[in-house]
Amino acid sequence: MRLFCPIYPIIASAHRSGNVAGARGNLKSARKSAAVFRGLQRKVVNRQYVFASAALSARDEPQQRESGGIRIERVGSYSRPAGPTHWSVLLAMRYGLQGNHREDFKMTKTNDILSNESLGFDPDVLAQRYAEEREKRIRPDAETQFVQLSHDSPFANKYLEEDPYSETLERAPLKDQREVIVIGGGWVGMLTAARLSQAGIHDVRIVESGSDFGGTWYWNRYPGAQCDIESYSYLPLLEETGYVPKLRYSYASEIYEHAQRIGKHFDLYKDAVFQTWVTELRWLEDESMWLVTTNRGDTMRARHICLGTGPANRPRLPGIPGVEQFKGHSFHTCRWDYDYTGGGPTGGLAGLADKTVAIIGTGATAVQCVPALGESAKQLYVFQRTPSSVDVRNNAETDPLWAESLEPGWQRDRQKKFGEAFLGGPIDPAFVDDGWTRLTRNLKQLVAQSEEKISGLAQIADFKTMETIRGLVDETVKDPEVAEKLKAYYNQFCKRPTFNDFYLDTFNRENVALVDVSETQGVEAITETGIIANGQEYPVDCIIYASGFEITSSYERRLGIPIFGVDEKSIYEHWEAGMRSMHGLMVSGFPNLFLCGGGFVFQLGANYAHGIDVQAGHVAYTISELSRRGIQSANVSLDAEERWIADQLETKGGGFVLGGSPDTCTPGYYNQEGTAKRYRNVRRETYSKGVGAYMKLLRAWRNDGQLDGLELK
């Protein structure tokens, strides 16, 4: 991002030295080495420094007015470009400082606000535009607009059971016993098994539906697929496996290879079973064991069960009339058909050279694969209901000298700093400086004012950020009409932000057409030969569904496993009034059962892998401690569940909310397709204090050593 949102009038962060000139408003050519250090805060905190979009200003008596309950200041300016660096330039110039200090400082001022003139837009006009864009996309069928795939549907079977990357593996049914069975072989399951191994628990079996480890990264092999979190923080267990990613943002092939690396390093392949779906879990009270049955005829027993299926394990399809009638070729992006398209994850889709292709969906997946489709297809139609916000990626190869200089503990430290920075904490560019942290930098620590005032300031900052991103569309896309349709008119975090250096430019190609379907709330129908949108039929040879996963459907549906606990009670019956647990991990009436990563998404942050590692370590500690004490059964008390719910209620709303309310966002999986009000239940929401606070909470529980809240036998 070339410009950052103008939140610096509230908190300025100066961290670089630079060349400055002159004194007061008359800049001269004399060069100085500028520096700003913490002691300067005492001198400037009571002065009026205002950040504007194109210039910096310093006035002792700013002119003020009121607008919409927010104080506005009109100021003059130095004729010098603005930006984070120039705070240090301005202040060093002001006080004649010299030197090479590089320490950060924060300057808090409660009444320095931007004017509409300096903003370059009218917040009221933008707010109205956002509301209009939301309303025209709201559908009464909400989440039911998507096809619910089931194993009984021949049409859906290829998205649930067929594996385009491997032949079926035959094996005899298993009837053995394990200390721990982990269900799921993606990051959640692998991290849980790895942390169990480190805790001395080696009798562990992973049951995975795919043909290898990797989970999402086994299935998602579409061209251009890559992580959107810095790989040094996202790829788990880097230090443990002695690996440093080749790129700052790894592509899917490298991530899948790392999953295999983890499996080999921790010897997880030895007892794992692949191409296997668990069909039921049943607690055997007289044995204090779980009975696990599968589609392969297995009847395994386990002392402990770890559910690690993750949130993106079930693809979804749009419920477009006629979707099953199409006579051409079709597939979901998570089951990419390279036999049809040719090429591979890096592109070169030669099989599409004479094909007219349609892709439905413009979320994070489409942003990554559309460039390769545009390069290869004879004609590409991109059907878009809501555009993604697309910022620059700026990927780069890993510096080998940097990789060699890393000290023990580097990844945990980096993950910790990313989590803090994402939630508005201090940022050290030497560790974390990417698109995510640029979007959220300093938003939490705005001003020591009321929550209402902070919300207003955050909204202005969000407007400015999105104006910058919309400006990038204008700079990149040559056709003004197409550019306007590609602009995202909603708050930054209404949808998962995307970062890509090739997506927008793809719409400059003559063989690529954007089909906006916002006015009709989506594609109208699919025929035997094509797609009907806006009353027009588009004949196509192939339809690619970039429609994502059932992220927010019920846990019962996403998991797809009947679970029966004490007295043969179903866990879904226990959750009839909403999901409930202790720590988001254990459920009363279901002894020795751990929900890892999928049931309760506790962290308000972007790096999911870090969050599940926190849970995996805690689960490993709990199981190893139970084993050490000779405990056969550990059941959460109802009181412990109620205390956790009470804690959730107490902290609800206390976390840092990025962007706008789900009630004001355009429809998407973040707000249950625009119906967030209906589904609000504190038992389903994030742990609003964030992953850092969650880590401290679990650490305190472990340090107490009492296994508080567990009924032990």
Model regions and ranges:
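Glycine-rich Rossmann-fold phosphate-binding loop(s) that bind the pyrophosphate
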Residues: 184-190, 362-363
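Short hydrophobic alpha-helical segments enriched in small aliphatic residues
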Residues: 12, 16, 20, 30, ...
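Short, Lys/Arg-enriched N-terminal segments with co-localized hydrophobic residues
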Residues: 87-106
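N-terminal FAD-binding dinucleotide-binding subdomain shared by FAD-dependent oxidases/monooxygenases
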Residues: 37, 62, 96, 108-180, ...
